[in-house]
Design a protein with these regions (language model features):
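Hydrophobic anchor at the beta1->P-loop junction of P-loop NTPases
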Residues: 15
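P-loop (Walker A) phosphate-binding loop of NTP-binding proteins
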Residues: 18
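ATP-binding Walker
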Residues: 21
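Walker A/P-loop
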Residues: 24
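Conserved substrate/cofactor phosphate-moiety recognition/catalytic segment
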Residues: 28-76
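Glycine-rich phosphate-binding loop used to anchor ATP phosphates in small-molecule kinases
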Residues: 63-107
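Conserved phosphate-donor/acceptor-positioning beta-strand/loop module used by diverse small-molecule
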Residues: 105-127
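Small-molecule kinase domains that catalyze NTP-dependent phosphoryl transfer to phosphate-bearing small molecules
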Residues: 131-175
Length: 184
């Protein structure tokens, strides 16, 4: 189902949600569906994580902030008609930070896919993945914090928002149609 999208201006589709909320699954599906380039904080920061030992939480956050800056630098240097998929938990920094990066990167249109997830499901998914995560990511001690985060997290709302209920099976066709209509 590879479809071509055009927006006529620099556009980002933010795939947003707390850790373990399903962002990567949706990002990969949309990239395959529309043939769009994607950028993720983890894919940028994890190659650097293997270069260091004993990555603590503050250093992990520094790497995340640097990866975030790389994302917006790449988007800022891209042609004006590119549509980017950006997979991140955008709530890890103030909303104003994202607003500044969007402006500096020359983004004219923002669409957001919000991954709504219950605290219980987020914790369960994160716990299941602990043994597969690169060293340096928060471990089991993060689970109570993640539960609180999932309870209060909200979308950024810089443009139209499509909410994916992670308690339900993903309807990629419905989501794809919404994106086509929204960007059309």
């Amino acid at each position: 189902m590879n479809r071509h999208l055009t927006a006529g201006c620099k556009t980002v589709i933010l795939i947003n949600g707390v850790p373990a909320s399903g962002k990567s699954t949706i990002t990969q599906a949309l990239s395959q569906t529309f043939g769009l380039p994607l950028l993720t904080i983890d894919e940028i920061k994890e190659p650097f994580m293997v270069c260091f030992t004993d990555i603590d939480r503050p250093f992990n956050r520094q790497l995340g902030c640097a990866a975030y800056e790389v994302i917006w630098s790449i988007i800022g240097h891209s042609p004006a008609n590119v549509i980017w998929l950006v997979d991140a938990w955008f709530g890890f920094q103030p909303r104003e930070t994202l607003q500044r990066w969007l402006h500096q990167a020359g983004v004219e249109k923002v669409v957001e896919i919000w991954n709504q997830i219950s605290p219980e499901l987020a914790v369960s998914r994160y716990a299941t993945r602990l043994q597969d995560r690169r060293a340096g990511h928060p471990g089991e001690e993060y689970l109570p914090e993640l539960a609180l985060l999932a309870e209060r997290a909200e979308p950024m709302r810089f443009g139209p928002v499509f909410t994916v209920d992670q308690q339900q099976p993903l309807d990629i066709i419905r989501l794809s149609e919404w994106i086509k209509q929204t960007l059309g």
